[in-house]
Amino acid sequence: MNTVRETIAAIATAQGRGGVGIVRLSGPLAAKAGQLITGRTLTPRHAHYGPFRDQEGLVLDEGIALFFPGPNSFTGEDVLELQGHGGPVVLDMLLQRCVQVGCRLARPGEFSERAFLNDKLDLAQAEAIADLIEASSSQAARNALRSLQGEFSKRVHSLTEALIALRIYVEAAIDFPEEEIDFLADGHVLSMLDSVRAELSTVQREAGQGALLRDGMTVVIAGRPNAGKSSLLNQLAGREAAIVTAIAGTTRDILREHIHIDGMPLHVVDTAGLRDTDDHVEKIGVERALKAIGEADRVLLVVDSTAPEASDPFALWPEFLDQRPDPGKVTLIRNKADLSGEPVGLEQCDDGHVTITLSAKGDDQGLLLLRDHLKACMGYEQTAESGFSARRRHLDALRQACAHLEHGRAQLTLAGAGELLAEDLRQAQHALGEITGAFSSDDLLGRIFSSFCIGK
């Protein structure tokens, strides 16, 4: 049986008790179900107040029935909403009544899946519904809404159209080699290609910010032993999450703490102090610390501002720079300002990193600077007119597209291989298509929609 032609039903409101609860139906039986349950023919897009009845004609509840005939509905099919009282027993009775008239219970995300299959939403917009529901901050909610309204999809479609235009130009040059002008070598292809790469880079950067807002930023606290890393973690967490002693090497393993700053999710990782050691257990901790540094979205490199080596903290541990070469992802924390007498403050350094001077022992001003800085790193200060939500799979697809464009450019400039460039352009277009669902496997769609709420 084609499950898309079945009529599905589910409770669309959150679990628990509330003033109003909604049962939603979608499919060819929606109009008939509305007639059987309400005892009247429902006028499209009108609110009908009255009783909801069972098979015997007994009243289950009283509420409002709304009928939306397809294709002018959320799913593109006939849709019925029964809005009654929000008690779980009442809603379950109403849902069972829908099953009696021929509906089946909907799978998680099946309403959004049908909207996608009926071209009412693309895949990025469908995912934005779940992101909007799960948003943990006002900025994340605004970004998700912009993705739902199609902002992210428009950017991807624009890139796709530019790739298609470039593919047409390149493949025409390949198909007509007898032309006197070598169109692949006239500079126009490289100009078009570099323009697409520049726009793709911009979308990548903005998508990365959107993913941080949605998934949270991983912040690794690193530094020498006794620099105050664990004290800083405790201040950010607002509790004694880590043991703090004067003994060097107290922290020997990774310690993770999930916190929120004004609704912004952060995954904070405290690490073992970076130093050479003969202690086998501590050495493993240092190795794990370096691995965490390489995987972090942001690194807080904590130094003791009273120590002599604080004048050149990046020279303390060469392996640190090997794992984190981009200074723009590093925030230098000059800790123990209460002992060194250094003024609390924030400085943007010439090489791209930020330095914050503070005391991890209750320095409210310095900790406020750090919190605001971390929020800014996550895109908290974006305006409502910029930004969109994105997921890790979107970032992977954008990276794949970028890699294909880089490879194709190299094939053209080094070998003059137009055919290989054309193939890389096709692969880049395919990668972008995975974002909106233009090219997506059934397995991928199943994984995405199964993570949605039932009734969405």
Swiss-Prot record:
Pfam families: MMR_HSR1, MnmE_helical, TrmE_N. Keywords: Cytoplasm, GTP-binding, Hydrolase, Magnesium, Metal-binding, Nucleotide-binding, Potassium, tRNA processing. It is found in: Cytoplasm. Gene3D superfamilies: P-loop containing nucleotide triphosphate hydrolases, Probable tRNA modification gtpase trme, domain 1, tRNA modification GTPase MnmE domain 2. The keyword Nucleus does not apply. SUPFAM superfamilies: P-loop containing nucleoside triphosphate hydrolases, TrmE connector domain. Residues 216-379 form the TrmE-type G domain. (6S)-5-formyl-5,6,7,8-tetrahydrofolate binds at R24, E81, K120, K456. Mg(2+) binds at S230, T251. Belongs to the TRAFAC class TrmE-Era-EngA-EngB-Septin-like GTPase superfamily. TrmE GTPase family. PANTHER family: TRNA MODIFICATION GTPASE GTPBP3 (PTHR42714), TRNA MODIFICATION GTPASE GTPBP3, MITOCHONDRIAL (PTHR42714:SF2). This is tRNA modification GTPase MnmE. The gene is mnmE.
